[in-house]
Swiss-Prot record:
Core component of the spliceosomal U1, U2, U4 and U5 small nuclear ribonucleoproteins (snRNPs), the building blocks of the spliceosome. Most spliceosomal snRNPs contain a common set of Sm proteins, SNRPB, SNRPD1, SNRPD2, SNRPD3, SNRPE, SNRPF and SNRPG that assemble in a heptameric protein ring on the Sm site of the small nuclear RNA to form the core snRNP. Component of the U1 snRNP. The U1 snRNP is composed of the U1 snRNA and the 7 core Sm proteins SNRPB, SNRPD1, SNRPD2, SNRPD3, SNRPE, SNRPF and SNRPG, and at least three U1 snRNP-specific proteins SNRNP70/U1-70K, SNRPA/U1-A and SNRPC/U1-C. The keyword Cytoplasm applies. CDD domains: Sm_B. The modification Omega-N-methylarginine is found at R108, R112, R147, R172. This is Small nuclear ribonucleoprotein-associated protein B'. Keywords: Cytoplasm, Methylation, mRNA processing, mRNA splicing, Nucleus, Repeat, Ribonucleoprotein, RNA-binding, Spliceosome. Residues 4-86 form the Sm domain. SMART domains: Sm (SM00651). It comes from Notamacropus eugenii (Tammar wallaby). InterPro entries: LSM_dom_sf, Sm, Sm_dom_euk/arc, snRNP-assoc_SmB/SmN. Belongs to the snRNP SmB/SmN family. The modification Asymmetric dimethylarginine is found at R108, R112. GO terms for cellular component: cytosol; methylosome; nuclear speck; nucleus; SMN-Sm protein complex; U1 snRNP; U2-type catalytic step 2 spliceosome; U2-type precatalytic spliceosome.
Length: 240
């Protein structure tokens, strides 16, 4: 059966309808759809049925059940009447428009990325690494060099250190004069011409303990070859 646009069924869409079935039950709900077999779809539907008492003295009572969305078969339908007009919000778009301002309860997409104008978090001062180009070795030190260049630089540094004059603290005078050549110390006779002056004690040896073994004291001839020199003061000579 073809349903025309002028059908009475189309005029009752979204109305509250009362539908009575063959078994006496009553369904009241919002009429949403139908077909040529008179199968109906009701939303927000309530069921009302009358329960007969067991005793004749008791009155017949009515029971109500909330069903929700219901599909009624047309073969069980007896009558269909209008219960009330459609709701006032019928036809209003429930999807928010693109230009409309969102209110509470409207879902919004989660933000992606960092919003503009928000400062980036920075690490504490003790945990932050050095700034690029600051706090590390210079670029000249990190530049790779050949073996000859490194050796020449090391030799130049050693020569500059060895040739630098030694500075002594003020108030203590200059370095002692070299021993072995030049004028003898006061209190000693000069050696005859053509004879080397005796060697003094080595540098750093405390005075008063004599000369080391093998070197005679000043003014004394050295022992002949193959013979030991005199023992130092305070030491007994070896037994024969």
């Amino acid at each position: 059966m073809t349903v025309g646009k002028s059908s009475k069924m189309l005029q009752h869409i979204d109305y509250r309808m009362r539908c009575i079935l063959q078994d006496g039950r009553i369904f009241i709900g919002t009429f949403k759809a139908f077909d040529k077999h008179m199968n109906l779809i009701l939303c927000d539907c309530d069921e009302f049925r009358k329960i007969k008492p067991k005793n004749s003295k008791q009155a017949e009572r009515e029971e109500k059940r909330v069903l929700g969305l219901v599909l009624l078969r047309g073969e069980n339908l007896v009558s269909m009447t209008v219960e009330g007009p459609p709701p006032k919000d019928t036809g209003i778009a429930r999807v928010p428009l693109s230009g409309a301002a969102g209110g509470p309860g409207i879902g919004r997409a989660a933000g992606r990325g960092v919003p503009a104008g928000v400062p980036m978090p920075q690490a504490p001062a003790g945990l932050a690494g050095p700034v690029r180009g600051v706090g590390g070795p210079s670029q000249q030190v990190m530049t790779p060099q050949g073996r000859g260049t490194v050796a020449a630089a090391a030799a130049a540094a050693t020569a500059s250190i060895a040739g630098a004059p030694t500075q002594h603290p003020p108030g203590r005078g200059g370095p002692p004069p070299p021993m072995g050549r030049g004028r003898p110390p006061p209190g000693m006779m000069a050696p005859p011409p053509g004879m080397r002056p005796p060697m003094g004690p080595p540098t750093g040896m405390p005075p008063g303990r004599g000369a080391p073994m093998g070197i005679p004291p000043p003014g004394m001839r050295p022992p002949p070859p193959g013979m030991r020199g005199p023992p130092p003061p305070g030491m007994r000579p070896p037994r024969p």
